[in-house]
Amino acid sequence: MKVYDVVVIGAGPGGGSAALHAARAGLRTLILEADPEIGTPVHCGECLSELAVQNLDLEIPDHVKALDVRGIRVIFPDGTEKLLTEEGYVLEKHLFERWLADEAVQKGAKLLLG
């Protein structure tokens, strides 16, 4: 039986990022994804600020970026709005999730799909 230091449940943005960081740190990492393919079904878009990208120590490739932005306007369900002026990216979420998992696997993580 293989022993892992880290088991990540789900290969979404949070799980993929956690798996990538664990694998980069040399931890024996297993990613368990219930779906047969990462990034499907596509649920929504994804935005990341440049500060978040830097804090996560990511170098996001151009093919997962849909748009560079200088800010976003968030409209909440109650109709209130908030303007965020940080630079960042709108991402193709399914491509971003696949890229994170691929990077983690390249660093030594094992990926099991449903």
Model-inferred region functions:
Residues 2-6:
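Extreme N-terminal starter segment of soluble prokaryotic enzymes
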Residues 7, 11, 20-42:
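Glycine-rich FAD pyrophosphate-binding loop
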Residues 34-72:
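N-terminal FAD cofactor-binding segment of flavoenzymes
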